[in-house]
Each structure stands twice: as structure tokens, then as C-alpha cells.
């Protein structure tokens, strides 16, 4: 604690003494993201305002660093009025600082959320008065069309360069005060512009706020004939083809545009869910039917465009060309007030036309003329000039009120062609001046030691002040040695900032690990292994959500059952992790599992297991699906077996048994994690609590748990879920090795068909396939719940007192960081590990079972507790490299393994021996208990037989007496 406190105080001292980055002075923190903080900066000489995005390199893995450098390279080549410009980039040994345009009205998500209060803001008062917001509706359609025109202009510019943004969402659409406000407000502060026309809209209204597309961390060059396969972006606005892990093209941005448009006109996203898997289910089940709220006032043209954009099949989705030529984008905005109706340019008399035109040609050139002149001047000028020339920027129409503004012409809504946009980019000649500068390494005391919280993805630019900007010349190109940005003294948050924090959950983006994809891909491959002949009826399919391809087939579709979260939200109660699920009889366990396997197989993979191999029967919905008993000869029937099944007769049987053993251990760990999850999330997130809904803080507070309790439960649940994921991943690794070996053998074996015809081989393949499909389903489910718990943990840590060791301000660099299959950069309290929790739980269960055994109470329950404790202790001893070559699937997998090893604290041999001794002790108790149960069962059978004999004797005697009395 003392170390963390001293580190925090050292960080505060650093921020007081060093507040300069190159030629800019850092004023205050105005935003925070997952890996970066955004500061308000000003030029030392001119005082022009900028936004400084400071990224701590130590918090980035290899993939995120590539995204950051990709963003820098892309922004260097882009210059457009509706794209946030990069002024400069300064790098040190620990941080990268991006000097960018400052957008003081915040982002579009805040604008939509505060739409009812726009009338109270002096910079949006006139807009709200002219185009009011209807009750319970979104923005006025005039404003929506205005923003769409500007967004389309930016996207057309990107498509001309074969760029795909991949993260279009309201949080990445930043706003500036309207050009009229900027031109007429004499008290406005200077804002450094990226180019001479940076504050001149290319489309839309001059009286409405100006929109700029920001955050190119996921952008990349993607020609129209190419496909990408990386899952990235924000889940709420992510295209379904990305959610399905399919390859996708630039049309993914069109889906995001559709979601943004829908949110602007209705005030809410089109699809809301607790996680991206549930989100995909809702998108798929909608059937491309987009409904609008009754309160929304939306024209038919706008509805048609939104529906064309929100087609789940990218082939059916509207094209970029059709979007750019759509009447909503190209035609004048209907419903404008008189002041905003474009006026034709004033015709000059012949007398004044000639001298004025010469003056305009020399002083105020048109956009294309000034562009060519500017480029010609720059080609002949030395490279010591800054990124943009002050003179063209001062000659902007915004600085000259009497200059004709291009957007006021009748064709202002037409987007300039490619050559008019790409050709005037000053990034080409300024590339050398925007190269990343590496000043001398600073002392360690100059670096902030307080890393930003993982999920606190706040507004990216500025909500701090609401003053109209004025363009200012760029600063001198010389850079002073960079020092770290530091947060100023804590200031009370403004209303806008608090509102922005309410939607912090929507700002998170998803980076799905390759292990997730590998698990699903392997399960898909194994599921296609030849099965027994199926009837035509059982071959009807619905494509699985994560399977590649477009799920357009609806023939014989089987509706998906409610997700587990939905079942809980609808009132299904959870059971204890070691209650009824572990105590079900073999017949009951098999019945529910059989039905689940049949339904899941038909829905996901296109075949059913043969009905005669699976038993039937109803069963109540358990808290979680128990690890199933698969239809194979001599397989155990309970959830957890004692493992005494004899030695497998062949290699395939041994592999199947090994896979099931690891899966069974993971199921026990999962059940323990569910106990924590049940306390943490009594009801699963619903439409009102999750993506696009109420803040996570609200649901936690309503549960009546303190912040410390939530942190403790979240940490324990998270490490247990990660342990379960590790065991499941190991099972899939074993299956992967078996699958590779089997394919290799069959490819060289000429008698493969004969082997496959064997009933035993077929049943064994069915057994392994069933296990793999169960593991895939459980893996995906655990991954979802781990993400929910991670978000709960991060939010709860922020609500702790600032002097609490788990508060984000006190996270030292050497804090326990969980870097696993599902989480990155989560800080845990000291002493938290899944192995310790599992060991304590196993001891507790064993002691309770021993007490009940001595008292002869609930002996079957004691047997279940002993078996569960043994499986949990075996999971404690289970290491990632036991009985298996070290996994080397990808770089990400290596990092996962490292994180998992750090989490388990690498048990030494002495600790392992202690755990093994406990396992032996519990096994002995289990053996004694089973002998007692067999004796009780034998005695019970003997008693039943004796009672049966007595009953038969009584019947015989009764019959003799009756027969004697009849003749009399």
C-alpha cells in the first residue's frame, strides 16, 4: 500500500513540474480511453488550442501498437474538413503523443444524449430553436441529414483512398461549433486548424455544428476487391459479418453508418444486448425488419436508407456509390428555416465584375485554385515549413465574412470528386515534418506512474469548454524535449463530462483473441466428421452464428432457444453449483443432455445424433449445462465420475477419456465461478442493462452490494472463469492433436472406409465430437461471462475510495495484471488466484461431507461432494504443459499462457505434494463411503427381499384360507 501511495504522489509531483510536450503546454485532462488519455493543450507562442492524445506504450500489446502506428500513418496521409487532422506526433521511450485538432463540442453520442438540453447551450441554442427535438424521439431530421452529408463526405474521401475505418460510431464523430458561430464570435479562443479549409464544411449547413470523423486506430487500406478477417470495432455498431468472424470488406462501415443514423433519428441504437454474441442473435432474428419508435418523426426516404444500410447480408446492403448518390445525401434538406435556405450567388454588374474578379483571383481563390497554388508553392518551398501554411488558413472564408461560402451554393450538398480531395492533401509534402520525433529519454521521475483504467473509454477529444474557435497559424516546427503529460489538480466534472461517462460502456471495443476463433474453427471441422445416416428431416439447418458464410438459409430453420442470460432475465432461478445438477440420476442427466445435443446439432451443424443412441425425457433447466455423458459404449452417466472405468483399449479411447476428464474439471471450476457470478449478477444484463442501456454502475448499486464486495466477487469470479477457460483450451488442444493425427493417418491409409464402418469407431468419433461441441459451447459462454465480470470489476474499482489499494490511481506497474484468453490489463488484488480459491473450496466441501458422513446424513450428497472436491483439486494440479506439448498456436496464445502461469503462481513441488495428499485422503474417504453405501444398498435389498417373501407368504396363506372356506 505504501509503495502504491508513494508512486501515486510521485506521479502528482511530476504532473506539477512537467507540463510541456514539444511546442505545446498541457493544460488539463479532457478525456480518457482504454490505453490513452486526452489533454487540452495550447501552443506556447500563439496560444492555439489542440488536443493531445497521450498513449502509454507499456500498456499496449503488439497488436495495439500496430493499430496505433497504423493510425499515425493514416492520419499523416489524410486531410479533409470532416476528418480530425493530426498536427504533429512526438514520441518518448514510454509515451506517444498525438497532437490533433481540438473539437470542443465533444462527440455525437453526447450530443444525442443531451438533445433535450441543446436549447440551454449558447452554441446550440439557435439550432435547437429552429429545429426542435420531439418528445421521446431522436434529433430533428434536418440535423440528422446535415450530419449524414458531412459523414458521407468523409467516407467518400476514405473510399477514394481505399480506406476502411472499421469503428464508425457516435463516440468517434466529434463536433465543432457551427461555422457561423466560429466566424461571428469575436471572443472565441484560437483553435489550431489542420489546413486552410479545415473549418469550412464540404457539405451540410453552415449554421449547424461541424462533424469530424476521428479515431483511426482500426482503420486500414482495404481495396474493394480485398477482404479482412480481424474482429475489431465497437460491438454495438459492429457489422454482423464481423460478429460472425467472417471475412468482410469496406461494406462493414455501411452497417455502422446505418446504426449511427438510426440512433440519431430515434435516440437509441437499433440493437441492444449484453454482449456481442447476444447482439448477433438479435440481428439474425430480426430478419432485416427495422422498426422505428412511434414517437420518432422520420421521413420515408430516411427510413428506406436506414433499412438499406442495415441489411445483415453485406451482399444485399446498399453500396457506397448508391449511398453517396442517395437523394437523402445529394438533394437539399427539406424543412429548412428561411435563414438556412441556400441563396444563389449575387450577380455582379459588368462594371464591378472585372476588378473584383481579379481581386478574388489573387486574394480569395476558389477551393481548387487555392489548392493548386498551395501545392505549387509547397513543392518549391523548403521542407522546414510546418504541416500547413498559416497564410492559406487565414484566407479561409470563415475569416473573411464577405467571401462567398461554397456550401451556400445550390449544389453545396454535392461531395467533391476524388481528385479534388486527395490531391490537396498537404500530408504528402509534410510527411517529413510529421515523422515521429524521439527526444532524449527523460528521467523516471518525469513519467506518470498511474496507468489509465482498462475500460474507462471516455470521450476522445473535448467536452471541457464550449467556446467558439478561431483558426490560428501552426506553431514553429522546432520541438522541445518532450516531458510527460500530467493531469492537473482534480476539478469538479462538468455536466457534459458526467453525461459522457454514462455511455462509457458503449465506447469499449472488442478484440477477440485468436484462441476463440481456433476453438470454434476446430469444433466446426470435427463436427463434419462422417456421422451415422440421417433422415432428410434431420438435415434441415440454420447456419451457426460464428460459422463463415452468410446465414441466409431459412429452410427448416429451428429457432434458437433463449440464451442463458435471457432465461435468467425471464425468471429462471439459479441452482447452487453443487446441488441438483450433481445429484441427478443417470437417466435424468442423460435425457436433458440428449435433447440439448440433438437440438444444438441440428441448429448449429446440420445433423442430429441418431435418436436411438440418445435417451429422452424432460428435465428442469439447471443453472448451467452439466458436462454431458456422450452416447458411447461403457461411458459414465453422471456429471462427475470417479474415473475408474478401466484402461482405454486403444489410443482414440484414451484421447476421448482425456478430453472428457479435462472438460469435467473445467465444469467443476465453472460451477464454482457461477456461485460468485450469481451473487454478482442476480439477473443477467437485459436490454436495459448492457450495451446501449443503463450504466453498469446502476445495476450494481441496485443489487445492494458495496464497491468492495463487488471488487472481491468480481476478482474471484474472473480468475475462476479464466481457469475454466484454460482447462477448456487444453481439452481443445488435445482434440486438435488427435484430429491432426487422425487426418494424417487416414490420408495414408487405404482401408479408411472399412475402419469408419466399424460401429465402435463410429461411436467413438461421435463421443469425441460430442465432447468437442460441448467444450466449444462452454468456452464461448465462459468468455462472455468473463467479459461481463471484467467490466463489473473495472467499474467497481473506480468507485472505491482513492486511498484503497485497488483503486485505479493506486495500480502500480508491478500490480497483478490478468492477461488471459478474455482480459487484458485487469488489475487484481494481491493474493487472488484461482488455485487458492479452489483448494479452499475443496477442503471446505470435504470437511462438510465428512461431518455428514459421520452423522449418516445425506450420504449420496457426501459422495457427490467428495467427487467434486477431487475434481477441483485435480484442476488445481493441472498445469498447461501436463501430458501435452507446449501450445504454440499463435503469439496471442503465448501471451495467454504467460498470463495464466503468472496467475497460478507456478505451484512448486512441495505445494503439489500437499494437494496430492489431500486428493489421496479424500479418495480414501470416498472409498469408505462407497463401501458403506454398498452395504446399505445390500442391506436394503435384503430387507426388500425379506419383505417380499413375507408378502408372498401372506398371500399364499390368504389363498389357502379362502379355498377351504368355499366348499363349506
Swiss-Prot record:
Where located? Answer: Cytoplasm; Preautophagosomal structure membrane
Compositional bias ranges of the Basic and acidic residues kind: 350-361, 371-380, 417-431
Please list the residue ranges that the record marks as compositionally biased, kind Polar residues.
Answer: 441-452, 528-538, 545-557
Q: List GO terms (cellular component aspect).
A: autophagosome; cytoplasm; cytosol; phagophore assembly site; phagophore assembly site membrane
Q: How does it assemble?
A: Homodimer. Forms a ternary complex with ATG13 and ATG17.
Tell me the active site: 167 (proton acceptor)
Tell me where in this chain the Protein kinase domain is found: 24-329
Q: Name one GO molecular function term.
A: ATP binding
Protein's name in the database? Serine/threonine-protein kinase apg-1
Q: Which UniProt keywords apply?
A: ATP-binding, Autophagy, Cytoplasm, Kinase, Membrane, Nucleotide-binding, Protein transport, Serine/threonine-protein kinase, Transferase, Transport
Tell me a GO biological process for this protein. reticulophagy
Q: Does the keyword Repeat apply?
A: no
Please state what class of enzyme this protein is. Answer: transferase
What domain of life? Eukaryota
General function of this protein:
Serine/threonine protein kinase involved in the cytoplasm to vacuole transport (Cvt) and found to be essential in autophagy, where it is required for the formation of autophagosomes. Involved in the clearance of protein aggregates which cannot be efficiently cleared by the proteasome. Required for selective autophagic degradation of the nucleus (nucleophagy) as well as for mitophagy which contributes to regulate mitochondrial quantity and quality by eliminating the mitochondria to a basal level to fulfill cellular energy requirements and preventing excess ROS production.
Gene of this entry: apg-1
What family name appears in the similarity comment?
A: Belongs to the protein kinase superfamily. Ser/Thr protein kinase family. APG1/unc-51/ULK1 subfamily.
Catalytic activity line of the entry: L-seryl-[protein] + ATP = O-phospho-L-seryl-[protein] + ADP + H(+); L-threonyl-[protein] + ATP = O-phospho-L-threonyl-[protein] + ADP + H(+)
- Region Disordered: start and end of each range? 334-500, 528-585, 884-906, 939-968
The principal location of this protein is: cytoplasm
Q: Where does ATP bind?
A: 30-38, 53
- List the Gene3D superfamilies: Transferase(Phosphotransferase) domain 1
- Does Coiled coil appear among the keywords? no
Q: How does it sit in the membrane?
A: Peripheral membrane protein
Amino acid at each position: 500500500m505504501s509503495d502504491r501511495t508513494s508512486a501515486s504522489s510521485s506521479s502528482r509531483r511530476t504532473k506539477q513540474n512537467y507540463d510541456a510536450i514539444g511546442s505545446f503546454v498541457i493544460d488539463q485532462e479532457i478525456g480518457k480511453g482504454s490505453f490513452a488519455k486526452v489533454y487540452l493543450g495550447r501552443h506556447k507562442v500563439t496560444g492555439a488550442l489542440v488536443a493531445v492524445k497521450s498513449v502509454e506504450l507499456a500498456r499496449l500489446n503488439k497488436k495495439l501498437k500496430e493499430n496505433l502506428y497504423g493510425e499515425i500513418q493514416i492520419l499523416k496521409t489524410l486531410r479533409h474538413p470532416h476528418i480530425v487532422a493530426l498536427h504533429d506526433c512526438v514520441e518518448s521511450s514510454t509515451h506517444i503523443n498525438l497532437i490533433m485538432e481540438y473539437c470542443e463540442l465533444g462527440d455525437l453520442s453526447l450530443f444525442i444524449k443531451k438533445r433535450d438540453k441543446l436549447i440551454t447551450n449558447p452554441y446550440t441554442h439557435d439550432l435547437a430553436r429552429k429545429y426542435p427535438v420531439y418528445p421521446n424521439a431522436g434529433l430533428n431530421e434536418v440535423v440528422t441529414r446535415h450530419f449524414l452529408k458531412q459523414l458521407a463526405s468523409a467516407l467518400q474521401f476514405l473510399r477514394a483512398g481505399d480506406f476502411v475505418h472499421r469503428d464508425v460510431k457516435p463516440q468517434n464523430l466529434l463536433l465543432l461549433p457551427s461555422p457561423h458561430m466560429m466566424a461571428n464570435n469575436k471572443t472565441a479562443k484560437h483553435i489550431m486548424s489542420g489546413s486552410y479549409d479545415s473549418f469550412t464544411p464540404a457539405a451540410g449547413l453552415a449554421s449547424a455544428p461541424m462533424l469530424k470523423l476521428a479515431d483511426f486506430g482500426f482503420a486500414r487500406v482495404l481495396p474493394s476487391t480485398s477482404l479482412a478477417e480481424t474482429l475489431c470495432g465497437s460491438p454495438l455498431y459492429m457489422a454482423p459479418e464481423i460478429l460472425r468472424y467472417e471475412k468482410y470488406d469496406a461494406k462493414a462501415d455501411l452497417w455502422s453508418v446505418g446504426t449511427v443514423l438510426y440512433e440519431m433519428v430515434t435516440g437509441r441504437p437499433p440493437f441492444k444486448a449484453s454482449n456481442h454474441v447476444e447482439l448477433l442473435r438479435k440481428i439474425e432474428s430480426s430478419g432485416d425488419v427495422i422498426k422505428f419508435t412511434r414517437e420518432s418523426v422520420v421521413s420515408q426516404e430516411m427510413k428506406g436508407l436506414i433499412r438499406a444500410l442495415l441489411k445483415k447480408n453485406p451482399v444485399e446492403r446498399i453500396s457506397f456509390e448508391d449511398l453517396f448518390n442517395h437523394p437523402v445525401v445529394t438533394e437539399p434538406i427539406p424543412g429548412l428555416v428561411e435563414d438556412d435556405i441556400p441563396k444563389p450567388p449575387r450577380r455582379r454588374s459588368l462594371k464591378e465584375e472585372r476588378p473584383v474578379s481579379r481581386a478574388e483571383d489573387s486574394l480569395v481563390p476558389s477551393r481548387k485554385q487555392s489548392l493548386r497554388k498551395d501545392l505549387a508553392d509547397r513543392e518549391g518551398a523548403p521542407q522546414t515549413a510546418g504541416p500547413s501554411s498559416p497564410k492559406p488558413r487565414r484566407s479561409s472564408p470563415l475569416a473573411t465574412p464577405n467571401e462567398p461560402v461554397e456550401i451556400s451554393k445550390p449544389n453545396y450538398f454535392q461531395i467533391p470528386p476524388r481528385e479534388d480531395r486527395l490531391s490537396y492533401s498537404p500530408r504528402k509534402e509534410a510527411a517529413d515534418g510529421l515523422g515521429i520525433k524521439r527526444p532524449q529519454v527523460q528521467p523516471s521521475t518525469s513519467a506518470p506512474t498511474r496507468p489509465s483504467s482498462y475500460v474507462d473509454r471516455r470521450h476522445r477529444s473535448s467536452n471541457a469548454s464550449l467556446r467558439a474557435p478561431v483558426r490560428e497559424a501552426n506553431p514553429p516546427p522546432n520541438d522541445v524535449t518532450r516531458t510527460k503529460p500530467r493531469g492537473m489538480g482534480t476539478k469538479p466534472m462538468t455536466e457534459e463530462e458526467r453525461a459522457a461517462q454514462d455511455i462509457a460502456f458503449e465506447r469499449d471495443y472488442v478484440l477477440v483473441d485468436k484462441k476463440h476463433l481456433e476453438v470454434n474453427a476446430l469444433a466446426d471441422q470435427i463436427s463434419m466428421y462422417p456421422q451415422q445416416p440421417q433422415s432428410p428431416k434431420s438435415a434441415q439447418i440454420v447456419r451457426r452464428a460464428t460459422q463463415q458464410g452468410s446465414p441466409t438459409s431459412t429452410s427448416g430453420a429451428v429457432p434458437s432457444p433463449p440464451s442463458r442470460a435471457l432465461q435468467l432475465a425471464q425468471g429462471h432461478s439459479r441452482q447452487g453449483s453443487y446441488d441438483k445438477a450433481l445429484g441427478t440420476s443417470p437417466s435424468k442427466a442423460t435425457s436433458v443432455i440428449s435433447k440439448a445435443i440433438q437440438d444444438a446439432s441440428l441448429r448449429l451443424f446440420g445433423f442430429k445424433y441418431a435418436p436411438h443412441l440418445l435417451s429422452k425425457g424432460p428435465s428442469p433447466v439447471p443453472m448451467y449445462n452439466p458436462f454431458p455423458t456422450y452416447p458411447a459404449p461403457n461411458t459414465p452417466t453422471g456429471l462427475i465420475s470417479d474415473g475408474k472405468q478401466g484402461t482405454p483399449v486403444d489410443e482414440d479411447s484414451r484421447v476421448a477419456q482425456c478430453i472428457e476428464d479435462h472438460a469435467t474439471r473445467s465444469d467443476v471450476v465453472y460451477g464454482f465461478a457461477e456461485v460468485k457470478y450469481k451473487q454478482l449478477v442476480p439477473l443477467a444484463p437485459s436490454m436495459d442493462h448492457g450495451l446501449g442501456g443503463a450504466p453498469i454502475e446502476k445495476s450494481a448499486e441496485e443489487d445492494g452490494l458495496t464497491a468492495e464486495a463487488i471488487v472481491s466477487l468480481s476478482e474471484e469470479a474472473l480468475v475462476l472463469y479464466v481457469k475454466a477457460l484454460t482447462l477448456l483450451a487444453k481439452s481443445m488442444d488435445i482434440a486438435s492433436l488427435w484430429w491432426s493425427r487422425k487426418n494424417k493417418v487416414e490420408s495414408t491409409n487405404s482401408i479408411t472406409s472399412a475402419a469408419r464402418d466399424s460401429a465402435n469407431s463410429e461411436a467413438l468419433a461421435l463421443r469425441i465430437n460430442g465432447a468437442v461441441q460441448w467444450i466449444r459451447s462452454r468456452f464461448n459462454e465462459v468468455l462472455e461471462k468473463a467479459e461481463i465480470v471484467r467490466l463489473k470489476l473495472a467499474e467497481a474499482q473506480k468507485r472505491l475510495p482513492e486511498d484503497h489499494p485497488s483503486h485505479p490511481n493506486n495500480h502500480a506497474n508491478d500490480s497483478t495484471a490478468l492477461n488471459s484468453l478474455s482480459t487484458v490489463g485487469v488489475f487484481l488484488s494481491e493474493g487472488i488466484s484461482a488455485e487458492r480459491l479452489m483448494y479452499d473450496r475443496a477442503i471446505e466441501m470435504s470437511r462438510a461431507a465428512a461431518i455428514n458422513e459421520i452423522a449418516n446424513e445425506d450420504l449420496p450428497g457426501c459422495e457427490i461432494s467428495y467427487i467434486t472436491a477431487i475434481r477441483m483439486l485435480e484442476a488445481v494440479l493441472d498445469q498447461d504443459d501436463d501430458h501435452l506439448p507446449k501450445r504454440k498456436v499463435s503469439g496471442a496464445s503465448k501471451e495467454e499462457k504467460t498470463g495464466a502461469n503468472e496467475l497460478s503462481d507456478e505451484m512448486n513441488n512441495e505445494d503439489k505434494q500437499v494437494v496430492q495428499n489431500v486428493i489421496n485422503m479424500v479418495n480414501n474417504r470416498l472409498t469408505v463411503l462407497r463401501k458403506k453405501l454398498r452395504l446399505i444398498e445390500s442391506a436394503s435389498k435384503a430387507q426388500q427381499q425379506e419383505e417380499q417373501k413375507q408378502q408372498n407368504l401372506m398371500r399364499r396363506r390368504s389363498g389357502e384360507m379362502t379355498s377351504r372356506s368355499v366348499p363349506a
